[in-house]
Amino acid sequence: MNTSVPPAVSPNITVLAPGKGPWQVAFIGITTGLLSLATVTGNLLVLISFKVNTELKTVNNYFLLSLACADLIIGTFSMNLYTTYLLMGHWALGTLACDLWLALDYVASNASVMNLLLISFDRYFSVTRPLSYRAKRTPRRAALMIGLAWLVSFVLWAPAILFWQYLVGERTVLAGQCYIQFLSQPIITFGTAMAAFYLPVTVMCTLYWRIYRETENRARELAALQGSETPGKGGGSSSSSERSQPGAEGSPESPPGRCCRCCRAPRLLQAYSWKEEEEEDEGSMESLTSSEGEEPGSEVVIKMPMVDSEAQAPTKQPPKSSPNTVKRPTKKGRDRGGKGQKPRGKEQLAKRKTFSLVKEKKAARTLSAILLAFILTWTPYNIMVLVSTFCKDCVPETLWELGYWLCYVNSTVNPMCYALCNKAFRDTFRLLLLCRWDKRRWRKIPKRPGSVHRTPSRQC
């Protein structure tokens, strides 16, 4: 991801001197070719995964999709054209191709850094202003922000690169070389690097620190909430009052075995429900908001067959309850007329907070991986920019070339960061690479009334 002044077009960079040995040329060509292939393949996997797996179509992943588009441009055009430039020792494709390459490279680079800023601000506001911000956080709004980022990048760089020679009345770029004409002075290159790299990195690191602090505060609050529940967990007073079931109320003759099985079932169902929600949101970087809007007083009725028992005594059925019905309250609702609901409400609140905290930590982990890769790959070049401002000839040509390619390697690393930190991306990549992806193998499983969750069938 080329996010500041590319070393390839800096006046401090010279092309490979003629006379390089054939083995050196072969090594450079093979290495850069493999890097380009890996970059294109990885980012194409991101785009295809987003298309075929609906679980990945979340608001925050739209920003990753835009980032992958910029990286794909870098891997397809920038890497290969610069490799040609290095191996030939001069620019042989003409001035128009040079300006178009530079414009495309800079627009994609600036769009990349702006997408990183969007991701950082999105995570920051999601954590610090969960109610007000998430109400406005829609795919349409995310697409608008991404489009604006690309438009601003285009307006900032493309006209200046393409038309500067006409504004000043002449083209001063030396024959056989390719660089931006108005960046011919080191001090201008330095100012551009400060605005395009150091300032955004400072903002992103500050936002990440705030996100980390807020997440830690939530973890402490959750620990305190769970600690306050501990004394009430031994009584089990809510097990009979929260559910209406056969033999659960006022029937001392109920067989213990049957009652025990019935009482265990809702807990198993509830645990499955939470596990299923967590699996669904494994690939999502959004925070839990839907459960906040559930209407109090509502209940979920789960139909399940009763377990037959051989030594079963006749029991008295409670009024208005079918033998195979188990009722449990929704996350914020309570079973009408039930007793002991306060501990149950606290338990659900703790689970909801735990689930939200886990998702926030996953999102922060992905952001930290992308940000770390960006800093590690772009810092060496930008340090050289600072040095060259005060000492023009202090940076060897080889270091400029390595610093440049290290910048491009960031576009190769980004898809690996998505797969490393996001299980949904990782599983989808694996199925695509093994040619085992088949939409017909995906089945719909109801997660809660009115919602659908897609999970791969066992055949996958």
Curated annotation (Swiss-Prot):
Topology with respect to the bilayer: Multi-pass membrane protein
Cysteine pairings via disulfide bonds: 98-178
Cell compartments where the protein resides: Cell membrane; Postsynaptic cell membrane
Taxonomic superkingdom: Eukaryota
Record carries keyword Lyase: no
GO terms of molecular function: G protein-coupled acetylcholine receptor activity
Keywords, sorted A to Z: Cell membrane, Disulfide bond, G-protein coupled receptor, Glycoprotein, Membrane, Phosphoprotein, Postsynaptic cell membrane, Receptor, Synapse, Transducer, Transmembrane, Transmembrane helix
Biased composition (Low complexity): 238-257
Phosphoprotein is among the record's keywords: yes
Sites of Phosphoserine modification: 254, 451, 457
InterPro entries, per database record: GPCR_Rhodpsn (IPR000276), GPCR_Rhodpsn_7TM (IPR017452), Musac_Ach_M1_rcpt (IPR002228), Musac_Ach_rcpt (IPR000995)
Region (Disordered): 225-257, 274-297, 310-351
Positions on the Extracellular side per record topology: 1-22, 85-95, 165-185, 391-397
One Gene Ontology cellular component annotation held by this UniProt entry: dendrite
Residue spans of biased composition, Basic residues class: 328-343
Segments in the Cytoplasmic topological domain: 49-62, 122-142, 210-366, 421-460
Similarity section: Belongs to the G-protein coupled receptor 1 family. Muscarinic acetylcholine receptor subfamily. CHRM1 sub-subfamily.
Subunit structure of this chain's protein: Interacts with GPRASP2. Interacts with TMEM147.
Purpose: The muscarinic acetylcholine receptor mediates various cellular responses, including inhibition of adenylate cyclase, breakdown of phosphoinositides and modulation of potassium channels through the action of G proteins. Primary transducing effect is Pi turnover.
Name of this chain's protein: Muscarinic acetylcholine receptor M1
Source organism (scientific name): Rattus norvegicus
Gene: Chrm1
